From Swiss-Prot:
Tetramer of two alpha and two beta chains. Its cofactor is pyridoxal 5'-phosphate. InterPro entries: Trp_synth_b_CS, Trp_synth_beta, Trp_synth_beta/beta-like, TrpB-like_PALP, TrpB-like_PALP_sf. One of its GO terms (molecular function) is tryptophan synthase activity. Pathway: Amino-acid biosynthesis; L-tryptophan biosynthesis; L-tryptophan from chorismate: step 5/5. The gene is trpB. GO terms for cellular component: cytoplasm. The modification N6-(pyridoxal phosphate)lysine is found at K88. Its EC number is 4.2.1.20. It comes from the Bacteria. The keyword Amino-acid biosynthesis applies. This is Tryptophan synthase beta chain. It catalyses: (1S,2R)-1-C-(indol-3-yl)glycerol 3-phosphate + L-serine = D-glyceraldehyde 3-phosphate + L-tryptophan + H2O. The beta subunit is responsible for the synthesis of L-tryptophan from indole and L-serine. The lineage of its organism: Bacteria, Pseudomonadati, Pseudomonadota, Gammaproteobacteria, Alteromonadales.
């Protein structure tokens, strides 16, 4: 069997821990990706879709009222303005084009908050591909607007009732389906995790976020930011923001995991800082595990961060100290969700609100002129009912 063309590991993390039946499919995907990256026609079509369909470049907005400290500027990279409502659209268009190039007729995907499912459904509608989306039954209930959007665009949404009925279970079902259908179907993984080559493919198709941010910052401020901040579930929006800054030592990279009800409780989703290394979802990565090594259920108010593991490149950036990973609780994210709406007239996704919460906290503690950029990874329309129910419950 042919050797791999790309390194499947980031330090000790990553790899291709899958049933033997899937190894040829992953190698075929890697070869197709490497060839596509060297094909000017493929790159031109991808760039055209990002610009004329998705609406890139997205704005870099200087907040007027959010920063609690006059010495600190907080910019927002506005992935919420992308068609589909979140950063997910970037890499989904790339993978869907890649699937067509490989002659696949069908797309299988998993989704948590429903944003990846919506992005996959719109890409499949655009490119004429059959679409099947696995979604935890709990997430189907808490993300009904996105479920309707997916079905409206022709996707088949399959609720998953096994396990905790959330994202990890949807991932397992999608992978199981692909094991039996990879000759005709492409598994369009939604985050920078899973078996090689997915973490690399997703990073490269999301890299545009950081590339644009760097260019826009130099135009606006004449210098790079002091820190870029992004929420981390599986980690695709964060790695998209970080990728172009990894080799810029003056820029701090900060990922924000969901602390849920508190890091000192079992109700969180912060495997990077509070997990143990294990094998899950085809990769070696930090995992939320109990003493017996069983995967613990993660928890977050935000469906898109409710994942018990994290992408292998984030694990490596954490291990080497190049990136710093913090956390924000449900309550802090809820406060930031409302604060951004009140201060700037922008309703963020609950996922992105975790990053906003940490940026405001960091700004408060800064003692010198500082520029922070937050990746506003998605808009909050999908979360208004969840937040409304919680706030009404709190008021009663």
């Amino acid at each position: 069997m042919s050797k791999l063309k790309l390194n499947p590991y980031f330090g000790e993390y990553g790899g291709m821990y899958v049933p033997q039946i899937l190894v040829p499919a992953l190698k075929q995907l890697e070869t197709a990706f490497v060839e596509a990256q060297e094909d000017d026609d493929f790159k031109a079509e991808f760039t055209d879709l990002l610009k004329n369909y998705a609406g890139r470049p997205t704005a870099l907005t200087l907040t007027r009222n959010l920063s609690p400290n006059p010495m600190v500027k907080i910019y927002l990279k506005r992935e919420d303005l992308l068609h589909g409502g979140a950063h997910k659209t970037n890499q989904v268009l790339g993978q869907a084009l890649l699937a067509k190039r490989m002659g696949k007729k069908e797309i299988i995907a998993e989704t948590g908050a429903g944003q990846h499912g919506v992005a996959t459904a719109l890409a499949c509608a655009l490119l004429g591909l059959k679409c099947k989306v696995y979604m935890g039954a709990k997430d189907v209930a808490r993300q009904s607007p996105n479920v309707f959007r997916m079905r409206l665009m022709g996707a088949e949404v399959i609720p998953v009732t096994s396990g905790s009925a959330t994202l990890k279970d949807a991932c397992n079902e999608a992978m199981r389906d692909w094991s039996g259908s990879y000759e005709k179907a492409h598994y369009l993984l939604g985050t920078a995790a899973g078996p090689h080559p997915f973490p690399t493919i997703v990073r490269e198709f999301q890299r545009i976020i950081g590339e644009e941010t760097k260019k826009q910052m130099l135009e606006r401020e004449g210098r790079l930011p002091d820190a870029v901040i992004a929420c981390v579930g599986g980690g695709s929006n964060a790695i998209g923001m970080f990728a172009d800054f990894i080799d810029e030592p003056s820029v701090e990279l900060i990922g924000v995991e969901p602390a849920g009800k508190g890091i000192d409780t079992p109700m969180h989703g912060a495997p990077l800082k509070h997990g143990k290394t294990g094998i899950f979802f085809g990769m070696k990565a930090p995992l939320m595990q109990d003493r017996e090594g069983q995967i613990e259920e993660s928890y977050s108010i935000s469906a898109g961060l409710d994942f018990p593991s994290v992408g292998p490149q984030h694990a490596h950036l954490n291990a080497t100290g190049r990136a710093r990973y913090e956390s924000a609780t449900d309550d802090e994210a809820l406060e930031a969700f409302q604060q951004l709406a009140r201060c700037e007239g922008i309703i963020p996704a609950l996922e992105s609100a975790h990053a906003i919460a940490y940026a405001v906290k960091m700004a408060r503690e800064c003692t010198k002129e500082t520029i922070l950029v937050v990746n506003l990874s998605g808009r909050g329309d999908k979360d208004i009912f969840t937040v409304s129910d919680i706030l009404n419950g709190k008021e009663e």
